[in-house]
Amino acid sequence: MNLILIGPPGAGKGTQAKYLVKKLKNFQVSTGDMLRDEIQKNSEIGKKILDDMSNGKFVDDTIVNKLIENILLDPNKKDRLIFDGYPRSLSQAKNLDHLLTKTDQKIDFIFFLNVSKETIIKRIEQRKIIEKRSDDDLETIIKRYETYME
């Protein structure tokens, strides 16, 4: 079973995905985690990702789509994926549809996590203390939230 969790940054997609991974024995596909991994590698792509994320922008779809393609082509993960924050754009949705068709898969359920801006800010402030994520400063989060809502 393949699932999609969508919602603004800080809505709890990652938290819910982790719970579902344990319950369903699926694999979490977290674009945020994948992008942070690329940043850690300090590659040219990682530097571009860091620049975009630091400025509250979403990372270019071509970069994200390639990372997703690598996961969907893994036969061990077929029909066992929980997408956390992907797709975020029409381009990403079209890419996902194409890749699902190519790999003979489908999305079984889509969940939208609807959370207020105030709640998101509170959660991010807590997450910043606990997880110490580089993309969790208040100004960046507000920019990402506003970009998401456009």
Ranges and model annotations:
Residues 1-150:
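Glycine-rich phosphate-binding loop of ATP-dependent small-molecule kinases
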